[in-house]
């Protein structure tokens, strides 16, 4: 007995709604092997998950794929988290994946975090223990695979920055069971080379299993106990290993490690030239400033030197002498004029000038001028003064007018 006849679309929608309402299918965690992997240009990822007996189609949209911590590959065992639903257009159900993790990787992460916490408590990560990276290394020791991309990158970067730096390469395994041992041996060997300034411990990117050799406890202690500073450049920027926390400097890539270890010769030359230029300018400015001070003090010294003081005093004396002469001359001229005026005045009142007109002067014997006849009565002798001489006379008589 049929309850209702449905269209294909109605059937697919009904199945979709039924699946979407199921709690388990909406919180599915599915383990399987990746196959038919396709990464679309839009960023969406399409693939299948399979096991020994079956498979299911999967899709992971770009917004979720962006947060993946590892690159997907066919044959990779994963655990996919998401929800099962129907693609109505095709009538097929598939797993819509929201997150994914590597199958079996969980145990490695637990071991990683456990060792990390242990070494942290023991002080291997303390900044106080980290050695200073030398600025001008002449010889760099490199521990890595002699055939990998890492050593090529390190060589290229070092040659580009400074062809004068020598690289001493210790060939080591960088993954596998014996890798940690060869890395430890490399550290010990390069520590014995006296002129090695710094060590780079490096390898290219890889999965957590491929990088696991760098999460070894003995290797961590070898890095910690190294007398020479160690830069680690393991994997890509997002990859962190135990020795990255122990090393003196962690670089995101092998190339970046070489950038840190090898100083750029051209940059150094330019810096030296800039320092030289700045020092030259500074010295010229200092010399100019001191010369100005010197000239100023020289002027002050010259202005206050005994020679200049004496010369100034001589000039002052000459000026005073000239002024004195002028004043004396002026005073003499003034007095001369006064004398001339008084002489003229005296000359005008000189009694002798009257005598030139025919007059005479009468004096007694005491040279006292006699102006009245009464004075003659008591005198016997008088002096008569002429314009050109004098005569002594005796008085015989006095006649009244």
Swiss-Prot record:
Xref: Pfam families: Exonuc_VII_L, tRNA_anti_2
Annotated keywords: Cytoplasm, Exonuclease, Hydrolase, Nuclease
GO molecular function annotation: exodeoxyribonuclease VII activity; nucleic acid binding
NCBIfam families membership: xseA
Role of this protein: Bidirectionally degrades single-stranded DNA into large acid-insoluble oligonucleotides, which are then degraded further into small acid-soluble oligonucleotides.
Family affiliation: Belongs to the XseA family.
Protein name per Swiss-Prot or TrEMBL: Exodeoxyribonuclease 7 large subunit
Native source species: Clostridium botulinum (strain Loch Maree / Type A3)
